[in-house]
């Protein structure tokens, strides 16, 4: 069984479901068909932004989308036809414990679209609830085994390590101190525990890190035990562009980081302005494309520095 994906990977993620519904549109509860169509139409604008970026020079073979089946089925089909890399989430939206969106039918829904990547978002703090971590690991192993034994789709693992209450209390509530001093170590430990539990990610989707040495430790852990082809990408976490740029430049200079997945920082503001009718749809598409392309340029320029200094 070959594990890993190590080609360039520049993902525009817009698989947000619960947060998109409530924070972008202000809707709660069961959606009407008309509301569902409005969300799908907004996601189409994001997708067209990616296409615009490719038309303006982003290499298509490096570009990919991450979008959900609920609001993006048509986008997933079109992107596959257009030969973009695609990713589709398997997790239930907006809950702390990982479980499958479609329960025992998860495999059927993966095979329905055959995305390049099946993505999971998992909150896993090694110093948190041990029983919860074990339950999550057992479900994730089911998915990992299915993908590697029976599917063409690869496993993209988005690892979030939120601070436990006690951890923050030790730092007097300083979340920045947690991100800098505590989270990197816990991320390494989480990857090790998941690997030991039989979860084999092809790509680790990682929260931003401020220090090069922490990026290097993540890659070393992802690669251990003969997993040399496993890739790592940086996620944006909805931060401001300057912070995302800092994380991206730090990661790009470390061999083993193959790209990024930046979503809200790219599309959120243009969609808000478009929905308030302050700009046209075409202008929103263009702005999303320009923002996405700017992050491609940032990553590639930083990586060029790495190669130049090697």
Model-flagged regions — what are they?
Residues 45, 108, 138-149, 189-193, ...:
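Alpha-helical scaffolding segments of alpha/beta enzyme cores, especially the outer helices
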Residues 98, 126-146, 208-224, 242-243:
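Active-site-adjacent beta->alpha loops and helix N-cap segments on the catalytic face
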Residues 65-68, 116-123, 129-135, 179-186, ...:
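Catalytic beta/alpha-barrel core
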Residues 1-132, 200, 230, 242-251, ...:
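Alpha/beta catalytic barrel-like cores
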């Amino acid at each position: 069984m070959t594990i890993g994906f190590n080609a360039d990977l520049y993902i525009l993620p817009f698989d947000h479901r619960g947060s998109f519904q409530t924070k972008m549109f202000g809707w709660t509860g069961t959606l009407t068909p008309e509301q569902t169509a409005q969300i799908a139409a907004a996601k189409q604008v994001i997708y067209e932004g990616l296409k615009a970026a490719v038309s303006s020079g982003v290499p298509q073979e490096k570009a990919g989308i991450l979008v959900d089946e609920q609001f993006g089925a048509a986008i997933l089909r079109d992107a596959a036809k257009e030969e973009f890399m695609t990713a589709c989430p398997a997790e239930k939206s907006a809950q702390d414990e990982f479980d499958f969106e479609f329960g025992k039918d998860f495999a059927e829904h993966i095979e329905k679209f055959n995305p390049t990547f099946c993505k999971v978002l998992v909150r896993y703090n090694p110093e948190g609830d041990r029983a919860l971590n074990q339950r999550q690991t057992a479900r994730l192993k089911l998915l990992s085994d299915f993908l590697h034994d029976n599917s063409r789709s690869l496993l993209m693992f988005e690892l979030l390590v939120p601070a436990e209450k006690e951890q923050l209390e030790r730092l007097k509530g300083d979340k920045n101190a947690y991100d800098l001093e505590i989270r990197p170590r816990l991320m390494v430990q989480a990857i090790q525990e998941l690997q030991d539990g039989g979860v084999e990610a092809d790509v680790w989707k990682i929260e931003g890190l401020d220090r090069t040495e922490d990026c290097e430790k993540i890659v070393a852990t992802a690669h251990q035990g003969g997993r040399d082809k496993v890739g790592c990408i940086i996620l944006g976490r909805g931060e401001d562009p300057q912070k995302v740029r800092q994380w991206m430049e730090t990661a790009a200079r470390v061999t083993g980081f193959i790209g990024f997945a930046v979503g809200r920082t790219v599309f959120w503001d243009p969609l808000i302005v478009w929905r308030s009718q302050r700009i046209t749809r075409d202008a929103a598409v263009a702005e999303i494309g320009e923002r996405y392309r700017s992050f491609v340029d940032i990553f590639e320029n930083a990586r060029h520095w790495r190669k130049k200094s090697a």
